[in-house]
Regions:
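A generic structural signal for ordered secondary structure
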Residues: 7-11, 26, 38, 52, ...
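A beta-strand edge to alpha-helix "cap/lid" segment located at domain peripheries
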Residues: 2-3, 52-124
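Short, low-complexity N-terminal intrinsically disordered segments enriched in polar/charged residues
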Residues: 1-32, 123-124
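A solvent-exposed, acidic/Ser-Thr-rich amphipathic alpha-helical stretch
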Residues: 23-75
Length: 124
């Protein structure tokens, strides 16, 4: 598998892990010292413990996720547009997001930045 194909596969594995509520699967994609800035402009979460706390919430609330366009790979980074559905019933929302992952030489995510804001959230 090429680096490009492997990085695109990580995008799908990330979404699959969120929907499955599989915290271990999501965390396995990240380096131990990775950072997550979600959304961009918030205080980054740094390291395995902070990521576990953040992603536990995501794994508990994401009910669906899908790519909404083709991931773009450049160098050691990939940008990809997707939507997640959170909550159920009349509390369900859809959030349109663009994530950028940066990878280390081992193919682990070392940085994740998520571009989204209030204008990107709508009722499901």
């Amino acid at each position: 598998m090429t680096d490009t194909a492997a990085r695109v596969a990580v995008c799908q594995a990330y979404l699959d892990g969120l929907v499955a509520g599989d915290l271990d699967a999501v965390l396995s994609l990240f380096a131990d010292d990775a950072t997550v800035e979600d959304p961009v402009g918030t205080e980054p979460k740094v390291g395995r413990e902070a990521l576990a706390a953040f992603y536990q919430i995501a794994c508990d609330f994401v009910t669906a996720a899908q790519l909404t366009g083709t991931p773009r790979v450049a160098g050691d980074e990939v940008a990809f547009p997707f939507e997640i559905t959170t909550g159920t019933g009349d509390k369900a929302s859809i959030i349109s997001i663009i994530d950028v992952f940066r990878f280390n030489e081992a193919g682990k995510i070392v940085s994740m930045r998520a571009w989204w804001g209030g204008d990107n959230v709508r009722p499901a």
